[in-house]
Amino acid sequence: MKTTIQVLVLIISFLNLFGQKNGTIKIDDNSFIYWEIEQFDTSKHTFEYCLESDLKYLCKIDKQDWFGSDRGLDFPKNELKKLEISISQTRIPLETSQMFNPNFSGALFESQFELKRFKDHYILFAFFSDGAGSYSAHWKIENGKSERIVLSIEEEFFEWQLE
């Protein structure tokens, strides 16, 4: 028993040392979200800067627009590395590219997600924010596969929270 506890403490310490957090969120009796967030590592990415009104800012990470900052004046603090949904015990990966600073605490919570069932598919709605740079993502889930259909800062994509 003592050895098991020591091993668990060692694993948790190791993960925290490298800035990795993960967890599970229960959506309903048949649906769960599994997530993994890592500390942002500048050595693993490429960067492009833009200039607007004499303001230089980080506009692209790995040649793509990125989400999680109001203007890209700083590097992201962390990165959403993995997101999966389990529906009726079928685990389905969700696209997480371009998604940074998903929450101020570095963890995700049930209140950030809503799963809606339609006739032949589901839509998973989510919002992410670390206090600045809020964005919304929507995934269509059908036949054991997912497609991210929205990744946006536009207000219209947050309206699902008002329903």
List each language-model region with its residue ranges.
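Hydrophobic h-region of N-terminal signal peptides that target proteins for export
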Residues: 10-18
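Sec-dependent signal peptide recognition
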Residues: 2-10
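Exposed acidic/polar residues on beta-strands and adjacent loops within beta-sheet cores, strongest
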Residues: 20-163
